[in-house]
Amino acid sequence: MKKSRKILTLLMVMILVIGSLAGCKKDSNTTNDKTTGNNQKEATDTATPEATNTTPTDVTLKVWAPQEEQEILKEMCENFKTAHPEYNLTFDYGVVSEADASTELQKDPAAGADVFAFASDQTSVLVNAGILYPITLDVDKITADNAPASIKAATVNDQIYAYPFTPNSWFMYYDKSKYTEKDVLSLDDMMAKDLGDKVKNFSVDLDNGWYISAFFFANGGTLFGPDGTDPTSCTFNDEKGVEVANYLIDLAKNPKFLDEADNNILAALKDGTLAAACSGTWNADTIKEALGDNYAATSLPKIKINGEYKQLSNFADFKLIGVNSQTKFAVPSMQLAQYLAGEECQKLRFEKRNIAPTNIKLASDPDVLANPAVAALSLQASYATLQSSIPQMGNYWTPAQAFGAEVLNGTVTKDNAKQKLDDMVNSILSSIG
């Protein structure tokens, strides 16, 4: 009965999260409408081949996915091949992460993948570059099947450009032999606990903009305005931003803190020298194996600034599957992209890799809600900040990484924190040409 109530509670959280994420973001093109509109028209009129009813016999599709997806990708593509005997299909697999898809495609779109996975913050950039093929296959179905926020993340100027398949965010894993459920509500309480000389209490990747932003958002900071659409606004260098910088300086200096680097958290969790670490569902199986019976996952903790507890608010975005506008096989490419992002493959990813679904039906499945990592992701999503997808977002990552690195190496101090934050924000808001 207790388990049933817990699952029902998580189901209610999922419903609220889907609704709240859908409502918290306006159309990502409320600025620069003229430019975006012209670029979209150019992409549609000149760069995008017309879909035809001609069925090619021989079809070769280049498909990109990250390294950790390669095994299951091949299984899914073979299933697609079996289901489509009208094509003589050959697949050319490539290893490109979702984070790097836009960069690699812009080098030479014609040499890029026909079908590829990418992070939703790249949507506007890829559309403006004329690289994404406008989706015309079963638009009503994918809109009805997936969380509204995931559809918004794949949409530019009311046109869907990709198929969503998973929320992309992070939360906290912990060793429940070292922390109680009450302990993990507060990072300050976690760091104050004496777990032994050789044990690090907490780890997060501070020199990574995807992670460090959570601390600024927790204290009321905004990136590109309240709704992420203003390329001229970032408040990370205001008074509250300085408070965050001071908190990060203290955290980095704490001997109980471990900066995440090259997945060093996995070995530390396994040998018992780390009590809690931040990551996503992509590491769920490995961390579960490392922690064994002590495996637990939850939302991010609160941090205490000026005597007040502030909830860490991570970036929330989505992983999408798109089609190259220069593909020679538009219809088969869209069919494959739809299948790879569809309910069957989302379920397969969940079962084999603990990847959370965007499919509404799967998101409410009791097996999904009973999974600790997926449940933690769902809970944290209610505290998350939807990641901006405007082109200016591309300017954020390097300055944020550099600031985090300087916090770690000690060159950011409480005396120069304001100047260092000013430098970071000026770089973030600099013209992208």
Residue ranges and their predicted role:
Residues K6-L10, C24-Q122, K304, Y309, ...:
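Conserved N-terminal structural module of periplasmic/extracytoplasmic solute-binding proteins
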Residues N79, A83-N146, S177, K182, ...:
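Extracytoplasmic "Venus flytrap"/periplasmic binding protein-like
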Residues T82, E289-K352:
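Extracytoplasmic/periplasmic substrate-recognition and gating elements
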Residues Q106-K107, A111-D114, I142-K176, K200-V204, ...:
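A structural signal for short loop-to-beta-strand junctions that line the ligand-binding cleft
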Residues S120-F171, K182, A296-L300, N306, ...:
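Hinge/lid segment of periplasmic solute-binding proteins
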Residues Y161-F165, W170, D188-C234, L274:
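Extracytoplasmic/periplasmic solute-binding protein
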Residues D230-D259:
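Glycine-centered hinge/linker elements that transmit conformational signals in sensory
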Residues F350-A402, E406:
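Long, aromatic- and glycine/proline-rich binding clefts that accommodate carbohydrate-like moieties
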